[in-house]
């Protein structure tokens, strides 16, 4: 399966589905695996009900998948308003599409795209149609995450025509596979819960071990670059702050202008501040003092072939790229090559710089400043000061205000009358409040977003957590390697070591509170659970790691450095440039409570599995440092293995539940509970690999603590591939890099 995901990358989805996932030999492999499991159960005489039920659930799921493979069909029907259709197009093996007859007729009555108020961001797609079967007619309606079922056929909203007069519905008929598969999911959930609470199960037996009773796991105590900005003119800080309090339509979302200023500054210079200037002052500088700021070396140019070829400094101005001696826009010829297929690193850097320069040009033209709302008939539209307003509903007074107010501000700025500028900006805010309708964010959302913009939570927390994690881990390792002698109870270093876990726990708690505030602010601002993109899932994963570390630290002090390190790592990943922290409306298909459950459960599982990785890594380091014959080493390795296994069982349960909740969501959203997407495949691989560790009784290598730790350390690579490899290399439906 792993190889198939790489083949798909280079040969395409249709090829790998026809040659691997849909082939007879692949189905046969699953059948052989199921038969071997049955033979093993019979041979070992496994009778514990929870274990039997768990493996039975997998057999039922495989049976459901087989029924779906053999008996189901999928297709699509294209509808136009007022036209009757009685055929659909079915996908057949080999990638062909065949037109087939429907057992009833369909007629599209209407199709609507619903938008978030005041924006062009789609909130939902709704198709209303009638089904005529013989002499009976019934009305039906489908939208994203709202399926209509008639007889054995399920209808899903798939796409629509550009003229808004047509809709494409996906069809799926799977009367046998879905109920059997869902029954398997239900059995899986029950069996996983049963395994965790079964007094005779492996998980509960871990709590009865001698090491738990003796507390052996307590052997460990705990385990923006400054810029030389010039003195370019801009608005005073207080006036610029007033500018930032205005609302703007940005990224298909109405938000404080401060948010746009922060993103504008980040994109230009790589950080939220430029020298002593606030983001609002940087934005105001380019708006009102464009010539001065075009000469300011604010644009960050990374090391690479572009800097080498053009002999550019690390910080350039806008004017640097416009040189009459060199023919005007010096990036022009290279940009033309980029759009003709030259996608090497040099030309990608050219495109990146051009993107930032065009942003500055559009700002100076005023097209980015959509700060003037007008509401008519319950619909709100936001305009920029230079926009050609063709809407006849906008009266002349509003039109003149929109077109002239920035010129008025510019005149006051040139005169240095910043008090008058403040008054104009206050009136603009009142204008927005009077004309913005329901598109305006609430006062709570505005306050939350301004706080969120002012505090770089992820940046601060990743540095703090990684630093504290390294310090605490070093202290713990030193104590393991050079234990404190107990014959001198009054030694000051012993008292210090006793205080370390208390202080570490308090600091981790403070870090958790700060991250909770960060997530809560994003939740308030976005009006949705913040788990829809890579940045947000990294925050959530770090949050779960810290919660688990604090809970586990009451018994296992080693959990503290583990919690700091892993949460710091996840926050570092969220901080890097590859992830975009902007808050936006999510796609309609993602507006489902099942998605929230799916992501949160998976993230909890990943958090637990990441801690098992740290356990394994620590064990390997101890073995390398202390050697094979060190006194007490075996006991320490056993203690780490016990902690790792205590984390493993709930992690597997959560991963299994998360995967199959995701399958149910997929079936509700687009009619296929399993599509062999790269993320699905690697999620299944991760589950199967970690499940091997739960079968230590059948694998001699895993019975030894060191062997177990080596396996768990290597198993973490599957998790890394599931999250990062798919997002940044393989791609697919689940890629949100």
Model region roles, listed by residue range:
Residues 1-737:
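Solvent-exposed, non-transmembrane regions of integral membrane proteins
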